[in-house]
Structures are given as C-alpha cells and as structure tokens.
C-alpha cells in the first residue's frame, strides 16, 4: 500500500485541517496510508514584526513547497488565503475544498461588538486588510498588531491591553470554538474577507498524476469557481497577504459569479470597493481589478509597498 506524506504548518489549526483532509480521503475508501509531516515556515518563525513587514509572497507556503519539490512530501495542505496568486509551473492545486464560513469575527474582552467598542479601544489584528476596514468603520479606535496562532492571540486578548481581536471564523470553527468565544460575525459589507478565506487548497506536483487524481475527489466545484475569480483579481492587483486587498465571490444559480473586490488605505480613510457579475471567473477578476484601478487602487497599493520597503 502506497504511503502518501502530507505536509503542513505546525500550528494546531493547520494540523486539524490536515487531519480533516485525511479523514475525508479515508471515508472515500482510498487504498493509501497517510503520514503528516510538520513544516515550519518563514511566517511562523518571524513573529516579532507584522506580516506586511516580513515581506514577500508565500510566507506560509514556500518551505512546504520546497518539501514538495524534493519529494519529501506528496501533498501540501494550505489555507487558500495563504497561497500566492501565481503557482510555480511544477505544482498544481488539485483541489479546493468546500468553503467554511468566510467571514471575519470580532472576539472582544467585554462582549462589545465593533460598533459598541469605546473610543480609544485597542483592536488586535495582523492584517492590513482588516485594519483598513476596521478603521474605516471606527476611526476612533486604535489598531495594534498581534501575531501568533489562534490560541496565542486569544491568550494575548486576555493578558495584554487589547479590547478585541479580529480572527477568521473558519479557523475558530475548525478548532471547535463557538458562540461562547465569538462576540460578533463581521458582515462582509463591514469587513470583506481575504482572497480564498475559509477554503483549503490541496497542492501536489503537476507530474504526480496519481495523487492529483486522488485529491481531485475532494474538489468542490462551486468554491473552486468562486476562489478562481478572487485569485484572478488578486493576481491582477499584484497583491498578497501583506497588502490591504479583500475579495469575495459567490456562484449564482445560473452559474454566473458575483465578485466583490476591495482595496483600502491602511489608515482606513480610503476604501475602494467594486462588485461585478460575469460568467468567466478569471476574466471577472481582471474586470473588477480594472474598475478599482480606474479609481486609484494601484496608487494606494504602490504607496503601501513603498512605505513597507522604507520601514
């Protein structure tokens, strides 16, 4: 029986997601053994600065792809929001799993919703996308950077001077946290999610046909189509997890895709948002990018990048 080695990050969330993938494959009765290999990525190692300042794309992916390239692992399990918009030609995303809740949530110390937080409250996030939208909604609060895995951030909320933190609903739900922890689900009109948020990506070598066919059994067509549109938008904007870009797509009953894209200034003073419907997912991503670029989105992102390079 062939053994398939699956690589992932070392966090409890990453391991939970990977074990979920293995469970799904086992339920299909596939004739393989599975082994999990934990890999530490650059994004996991550097925790004393914000993600935007760590710089580069694929902060949580490159080391896992290196293990894939060398044959040390056969499959990489990623959170789709961590996957760069362009894959190297030697790799393929054989499956994108059905999306968990794509929204962000607010977890607050005193049970305050975003609108109820007192002026001057400190909100923790590691994302420029989240900070831009939080400050746009509540310019009277402060955003303070917070890094670490889910458990670390929840502990910091209790032990440090944060009034609230913003996390992905999907991660909390996969770890078993529920309404006793989540104060408020942030509507997508308030905080548009990251590209691919809530979906998992299963990556393998493009020449490994057997593994590609195996993983394809877990591909969710509707999620895949939506995420394709989002990633086309991200690619066209030349974005990554270190710039303030959001995007969320849904597939309508007739098969068309509705995509909303967002670019914001980190201080929240400018939020550009456009929505458009189309039948061809990747073309739609380009069209939404063009609409935002015409409003000045490119200039906002260029300013962010130059400030990051200078810091």
UniProtKB/Swiss-Prot annotation:
Keywords of the record: Porphyrin biosynthesis, Transferase
GO annotations of cellular component type: cytoplasm
Catalytic activity: 4 porphobilinogen + H2O = hydroxymethylbilane + 4 NH4(+)
Keyword Mitochondrion part of the UniProt annotation: no
InterPro entries on file: HemC, Porphobilin_deaminase_cofac_BS, Porphobilin_deaminase_N, Porphobilinogen_deaminase_C, Porphobilinogen_deaminase_C_sf
Listed cofactors: dipyrromethane
A biological process term (GO) from this entry: protoporphyrinogen IX biosynthetic process
Pathway: Porphyrin-containing compound metabolism; protoporphyrin-IX biosynthesis; coproporphyrinogen-III from 5-aminolevulinate: step 2/4
GO molecular-function term, one example from the UniProt record: hydroxymethylbilane synthase activity
Note: The porphobilinogen subunits are added to the dipyrromethane group.
Protein name per Swiss-Prot or TrEMBL: Porphobilinogen deaminase
Organism field: Shouchella clausii (strain KSM-K16) (Alkalihalobacillus clausii)
Source organism phylogeny: Bacteria, Bacillati, Bacillota, Bacilli, Bacillales
Gene this chain is encoded by: hemC
